Amino acid sequence: MALLDLCGAPRGQRPEWAAVDAGSGLRSDPGHYSFSVQAPELALPRGMQPTEFLRSFGDDQERKVQIEMAHGTTTLAFKFQHGVIVAVDSRASAGSYIATIRVNKVIEINPYLLGTMSGCAADCQYWERLLAKECRLYYLRNGERISVSAASKLLSNMMLQYRGMGLSMGSMICGWDKKGPGLYYVDDNGTRLSGQMFSTGSGNTYAYGVMDSGYRQDLSPEEAYDLARRAIVYATHRDSYSGGVVNMYHMKKDGWVKVESTDVSDLLHKYREATL
């Protein structure tokens, strides 16, 4: 119950946090996206509007410059008859500088929800970890898991409150709920899209080319793994900001499983040898 204490709830069950009985006459008002948390300011970073704060240190000409983040990645996800496949590269770059090649760009929100990272790593990690907290609070309050649609809507609402403040995030939220597998795209403008297949990051055009040529709804698990694997490998080969290893997850009815973490260089050599 430490999470409840952190969010301002006293010991014991709070009446307004409990599920409201339809005949009780009580009102259930979850607030913005914080599900009646007493201190929602915990979810809001303090300080000035970030873009204006940074511009205040420059001269008149520099204050008119658009702040641009230096980043790059390749992430993808698609639905098929056996669930959802999520595959990402692992290179973290800042322009031409490669910071590390061992970043897991999949945020494990809970056993039935996954989120991907594309854009500014700090923004993606912070907001998706906050989403994980909200999903946990939803479970504690309602006694059931949040749906994939509702989780993606929460993240979209968070982004809408910070539109124009310099956030950089393009995330895919995927999971399994009562309606089956779900896949949504959410970005820093609050855009929220549902679809069968998405790819984000600087290498997404190359990944889409591979996926479009081999995607079918009736893929077997092994065929789906191979399609996602090839899409990431060929994207990293053509996109200088992507690389490292292929981290792949399979979202099933009983939760996600991590399929593999394989070096893209080894896979590329394997594919080339197979064509000789």
From Swiss-Prot:
The gene is Psmb8. Its main location: cytoplasm. Residues 1-72 form a propeptide. GO terms for biological process: antigen processing and presentation; fat cell differentiation; proteasome-mediated ubiquitin-dependent protein catabolic process. It is found in: Cytoplasm; Nucleus. The keyword Protease applies. One of its GO terms (molecular function) is threonine-type endopeptidase activity. Keywords: Cytoplasm, Differentiation, Hydrolase, Immunity, Nucleus, Protease, Proteasome, Threonine protease, Zymogen. GO terms for cellular component: cytosol; nucleus; proteasome complex; proteasome core complex; proteasome core complex, beta-subunit complex; spermatoproteasome complex. Induction: Up-regulated by interferon gamma (at protein level). Down-regulated by theophylline (THP), a reprotoxic agent thought to induce infertility. This is Proteasome subunit beta type-8. Pfam families: Proteasome.
